[in-house]
């Protein structure tokens, strides 16, 4: 990892799944087409199995905090016993530039970030590569493949909703007809009741998450 010039900091992490695990900070340009505009640090979690093994890159759509857990391992990495590179999305948590100039938060910039990470890590992991993500991470997997079709060997988006706009318009008609009228009414009544009891229920949810070690 120290041989990768983009990495400015490396911290070891505990893992019950991998022989070695680290959180690293990878220097990225705000705009890959105009590097003179400045840089930011992107959090990348590296989980090692072997230099001769394939590598899964998780194209997270938001923050990477849950990937720090000693128990975390992405499904494909477990199935195929691969190394795992987990990339936090720019402008989330510890991958947020200062100042926050939102014009650089684009799908293309995110794909550029992933391309830079893959190019750097292929120097130590030369085997097959799989990209994968869930929900917005699934979108990110698809967009990464769109901008850089040759970076990975396989792309596996677990759910990849592509919205038509800020107001998509497809969700409401679907929700109005899915299931039976009685089932829809029960769900609506439950949701309203939970909102009415938010002040009482939220502390219980938080206590449960703390006791279970959920993040």
Which role does the model predict for each range below?
Residues 1-83:
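Catalytic-loop region of hydrolases
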Residues 55-58, 84-87, 130-132, 154-157:
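Structural recognition of the beta-strand scaffold that forms the well-ordered cores
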Residues 63, 89-93, 162, 179:
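Alpha/beta-hydrolase active-site loop signature
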Residues 77-96:
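Conserved alpha/beta-hydrolase
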Residues 104-123:
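Alpha/beta-hydrolase active-site loop
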Residues 125-135:
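Alpha/beta-hydrolase fold nucleophile elbow
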Residues 133-137, 141, 145:
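Gly/Ala-rich beta-loop-alpha elbow adjacent to hydrolase catalytic centers
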Residues 143-215:
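Alpha/beta-hydrolase
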